[in-house]
Amino acid sequence: MQSKFIVIEGLDGAGKSTAISFVRKYLEKNNLAAIYTREPGGTKIAEELRNLVLHNKYDEEIHSDSELLMIYAGRVQHYRNLIAPALEKGINVVSDRFYWSSMAYQGGGRGVELSKIRALNDNFLNGCEPDLVIYLDIDPILGLQRAQKVGSPDRIEKAGLEFFNRTRNVFKDLVKDSDNAIEIDAAKSIQEVEKQIYLILDKHFNFQN
């Protein structure tokens, strides 16, 4: 079976970590090898860039274009050093976020032109597209309430409600325009989200469990 690149997307507080735990449980049950990673981050250098983007400790504003480029510098490291090699070896890759998050957060939220982001993906990631995107949709108010229960808000989580409304709108547009993305209502119970994820994976891997 050809290796798969599966990405979980969604706003902060949508439950991506929980969703990934369900994906892990499913793949392990079916004896499918996989690595589990995240963005921003995924490699040592990418994690350093993540920390700078989310927890800027300097008395200097990060321009929206700079934010995008720092995230993409980390993404290139992540893709070249972890994602692509694993897929080439026949190992499935499951990632908490990929380039859709830049389209939504930096494009929708910050207002960076989407064409710039697509160009980065085409030029530096060989136009890499996930085999499956599971998008967890949630109202930004509920998502931020959930995120605040986990810990102190990071730099992006402090961006405000309108920022997250714009981000959500781009996510939903991406799902509509994609042939390999499925939206799940993340406001539903954990049990219902788990059930839907298993059904999606059954169909994707042609399994009947």
From Swiss-Prot:
<keyword id="KW-0418">Kinase</keyword>
<feature type="binding site">
    <location>
        <begin position="10"/>
        <end position="17"/>
    </location>
    <ligand>
        <name>ATP</name>
    </ligand>
</feature>
<keyword id="KW-0547">Nucleotide-binding</keyword>
<comment type="similarity">
    <text>Belongs to the thymidylate kinase family.</text>
</comment>
<dbReference type="Pfam" id="PF02223">
    <property type="entry name" value="Thymidylate_kin"/>
</dbReference>
<dbReference type="GO" id="GO:0005829">
    <property type="term" value="C:cytosol"/>
</dbReference>
<dbReference type="InterPro" id="IPR027417">
    <property type="entry name" value="P-loop_NTPase"/>
</dbReference>
<keyword id="KW-0545">Nucleotide biosynthesis</keyword>
<keyword id="KW-0808">Transferase</keyword>
<dbReference type="GO" id="GO:0006235">
    <property type="term" value="P:dTTP biosynthetic process"/>
</dbReference>
<dbReference type="InterPro" id="IPR039430">
    <property type="entry name" value="Thymidylate_kin-like_dom"/>
</dbReference>
<comment type="function">
    <text>Phosphorylation of dTMP to form dTDP in both de novo and salvage pathways of dTTP synthesis.</text>
</comment>
<dbReference type="GO" id="GO:0004798">
    <property type="term" value="F:dTMP kinase activity"/>
</dbReference>
<protein>
    <recommendedName>
        <fullName>Thymidylate kinase</fullName>
        <ecNumber>2.7.4.9</ecNumber>
    </recommendedName>
</protein>
<dbReference type="InterPro" id="IPR018094">
    <property type="entry name" value="Thymidylate_kinase"/>
</dbReference>
<dbReference type="GO" id="GO:0006233">
    <property type="term" value="P:dTDP biosynthetic process"/>
</dbReference>
<dbReference type="InterPro" id="IPR018095">
    <property type="entry name" value="Thymidylate_kin_CS"/>
</dbReference>
<dbReference type="GO" id="GO:0005524">
    <property type="term" value="F:ATP binding"/>
</dbReference>
<dbReference type="GO" id="GO:0006227">
    <property type="term" value="P:dUDP biosynthetic process"/>
</dbReference>
<keyword id="KW-0067">ATP-binding</keyword>
